[in-house]
Amino acid sequence: IGVGGIGKSSYHFTSNDACRLVAVCDVDRNHLDSAVALGRKKFGQKLEAYHDYRDLITDPNVDIVHIATPPHWHGIMAVEAAKAGKDIWCEKPMTRTIGEGKRVVEAVKRNGRIFRLNTWFRFKDTFYGLGTTVEPLKKLVDSGLLGWPLKVTISGATGFAWKFFWVGKENLTPQPVPAELDYDMWLGPAPWKPYNKHRVHATFRGYWDYDGGGLTDMGQHYMDPVQYLLGKDDTSPV
């Protein structure tokens, strides 16, 4: 669900003996058409194309739902997918608020589903630019050789400059909604604001209506591996 950027990344359109892509969904017709064409090219088959996510999660051929929309939709879609009996792979952040996250946890447990949050920095081959995976560092920390307690300093400087493009802007000039975009459906539970292209798609990250700020967006990429290294997956950063 959501095939504009991350949802249409190469690793989502890769053959896998354990599963196959059967359907895509997006409220932007251009994104949807592009994903269908890519699916035909990669797999030689026609993917089901849905405009409304509710139609996708009730498709009997769908077992796992991948949520790759802006975060203001994550909680609602995850709860509805769990209620529909689907397992869920959700992009970060899990939700915009703690309350939404609790509702997702409750729905997943109540319906006996599997939920996977896609926090992939802990799996990177060049962890924090050190030229290694996270596993050797995990073994070093667990060995106790570094002592305890450990202090970890995190910097988001890597690749930071280009992220200024994501910073939200005030007093945006209203623009006509593109014909291919269902803007009302894109907004969904978010407050209505006049359309401006900077508020949608990749640059939605700069607006509190759709995301939770830098820490929940790119910040979690840096905090999540540290949580794992320190054995704190069941806690929250302070």
Model regions: which residues?
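N-terminal glycine-/serine-/threonine-rich beta1-alpha1-beta2 phosphate-ribose binding loop
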Residues: I1-C90, G99-F115
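A structural signal for well-ordered alpha-helical segments within the folded catalytic domains
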Residues: G4, G75, V79, K102, ...
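Residues embedded in well-ordered beta-strands within globular domains across many folds
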Residues: A23-C25, H66, L150-T153, L187
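Active-site/binding-pocket entry motifs
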Residues: N30, T158, W192-K193
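A contiguous active-site-proximal alpha/beta segment in oxidoreductase catalytic domains
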Residues: D87-W89, T95-D182
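Rossmann-like dinucleotide-binding domain that binds NAD(P)(H)
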Residues: P174-V177, D184-V238
